[in-house]
Amino acid sequence: MTEKSNHLNQPSSKTWSGRFNEPVAELVKQYTASVGFDYRLAEYDIQGSLAHARMLGAQGIISQDDVAQIEQGLGEIMDEIRNGEFAWLLDLEDVHLNIEKRLTDKIGDAGKRLHTGRSRNDQVATDIRLWLRSMVDDALSRLRKLQASLVALAEQHADTVMPGFTHLQVAQPVTFGHHLLAYFEMLQRDAERLVDARKRINRLPLGAAALAGTSYPIDRERVAHELGFEAVCENSLDAVSDRDFAIEFTAAAALIMTHLSRLSEELILWSSPRFGFIDIADRFCTGSSIMPQKKNPDVPELVRGKTGRVNGHLVALLTLMKSQPLAYNKDNQEDKEPLFDTVDTLLVTLEIYADMLRGIKVNKDAMRLAAAEGFATATDLADYLVKKGMPFRDAHEVVALAVRHAVEQGCDLADLSLSQLQKFSPEIAEDVYGVLTLEGSLASRNHRGGTAPAQVREALKRARALLG
């Protein structure tokens, strides 16, 4: 759908104006109108209206001639919208009444019969579900591409040694591939959450009408089948009043953004001169207006920043719903802008992130040097002593003393002589030096989920299988 046409603040009679003695104030019109943002639902609104009209015809509620006129008119309106020729009127409040008014102008009384057995309450709930279902499918597709980019980079670095961190302090050696696959696992759970949320999105509210259902002999299952819904909402009050499906999606989106924010923080650190682990492609960075040497990682910084935006939308939607009595309330008009912006932010972030990962260059030497300088094999020395029969807590104390001595000497554990090491424990023998290598440390974690290169390759196979 193209961007909305100009909003024309022209007078027009409202569908509900018969009850009132005076027109709505102009400022109130502007305050209450939603067409400035819900126009995005137009194509889905038309899809729902077409299915509703066909059902009304099949049930004998309106004539087949009316159905044919409605189909013709809505088809023409769809073309107008796609071509940017549709005039959205602020005076008509929202996407639904704008389309209905245009339809009635085109086909007369047949257009007035379209809303039979329907309310804007179940209409908008249907529109949002149709739209969000499509957006979830788009997000899943982009998420899979991002996961594929992670796997491709991890495959290149299944053996690349880097320091693993806790508290941002060097902890133990891992491989860069293993580190990247941690994010693959997070995103895999995110994908599962989206798939699961889609099941609850994919329920048809139409037929609930305003709140109590309708007295017309409608066939909700027929409409659900035509629109691709798995089932109908079972309670009319619930169908029109709750937006938990939108909140659930936004929560899933917030988790995706949070995971990408964590990775972004690491990319920012790793690309800094203090680390020098990676180089982010120039097309994802910007310079400084005053400092000629600067190369700023703007994309990961913005991902980190936009995560707060999406998290804020989640809180906004939760707060929106928390005090509403059943059934529909005008408060729910405020669900769309946070939801729309969440989708927009998520989709572009997923797309740009996949491309950014493909452009990363890795400095293997810098990674290895950082792992070698941080006593990353200290735990391996403790495990070595445990395998010699020493209780782990005693081994922990022995190695801590050895590390302190190495710090005082300005060297690593592997640089200490055998006699120096044996001062801390006579159990230490010549074979300890094989344990204190980075490769030895990695190879010893040779179990499912471990960081041994062989296990990383097995994990990569499983990841590829998940992606298909």
UniProtKB/Swiss-Prot annotation:
Signal sequence extent? none
Q: Which NCBIfam families match?
A: argH
Where does the protein end up?
Cytoplasm
Q: What is this protein called?
A: Argininosuccinate lyase
Stored PANTHER family: ARGININOSUCCINATE LYASE
Keyword Amino-acid biosynthesis applies = yes
The text of the family note is: Belongs to the lyase 1 family. Argininosuccinate lyase subfamily.
Q: State the UniProt keywords alphabetically.
A: Amino-acid biosynthesis, Arginine biosynthesis, Cytoplasm, Lyase
- Record InterPro entries: Arg_succ_lyase_C, Argininosuccinate_lyase, Fumarase/histidase_N, Fumarate_lyase_CS, Fumarate_lyase_fam, Fumarate_lyase_N, L-Aspartase-like
Which domain of life, per UniProt?
Bacteria
What would be one Gene Ontology cellular-component term for the protein? cytosol
* Listed EC numbers: 4.3.2.1
> Per its UniProt record, what CDD domains does this chain match?
Argininosuccinate_lyase
Q: Give the pathway annotation.
A: Amino-acid biosynthesis; L-arginine biosynthesis; L-arginine from L-ornithine and carbamoyl phosphate: step 3/3
Say which enzyme class the record assigns: lyase
Q: What catalytic activity does the UniProt entry give for this protein?
A: 2-(N(omega)-L-arginino)succinate = fumarate + L-arginine
Question: Coiled-coil region(s) at which residues?
Answer: none
